[in-house]
Amino acid sequence: MSGNLLPHGDAFPEVAPSAWVAPGAYVVGDVHLGEESSVWYGAVLRGDTEPIRVGARTNIQDGCVVHADPDFPAIIGDDCVVGHKAIVHGCEIESGCLIGMGATILNGAKIGEGSIVAASALVPEGKEFPPRSLIVGIPAKSAKEVSEEQTEDIARGVRTYVERAASHRESLGRNA
């Protein structure tokens, strides 16, 4: 574990021992990071109004923002990939999802298990998608069902980021 872990009020981030937070990333307040999860350079997870929960082996990539509003916690399941510069705001992302680079998911939205939100898609407030949805566009809509090949690609991405986090942790520990 490294990076910037900061309290807010009485809440301090809870980071699993095997999770990794990159230098330059900020994890603030009521945030829980699961085992082997990772938060990459320049990402911000700010749990100052409601909790943020990130499951096991989920990666929050460079430049992402995860935040919540009153009555809208941010929940991200296990084995998710949240691509560079995505915004996850007061919503629920079930396990096994891929959130594409630059996608935005707003308050009260729910992304079903094993779904893909395409790069730059905008999921409006309160919009819900069933499991295995391929979600595209502005505003987002379901285009089709996620294929087995796409599901395997998500799992491969999860494994890759678990390995990369371990590599970065080792390199930084060696060169600190």
Labelled PLM ranges:
Residues 1-14, 48, 54-56, 62-64, ...:
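Glycine-rich hexapeptide-repeat left-handed beta-helix
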Residues 8-53, 71:
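N-terminal first-folded block
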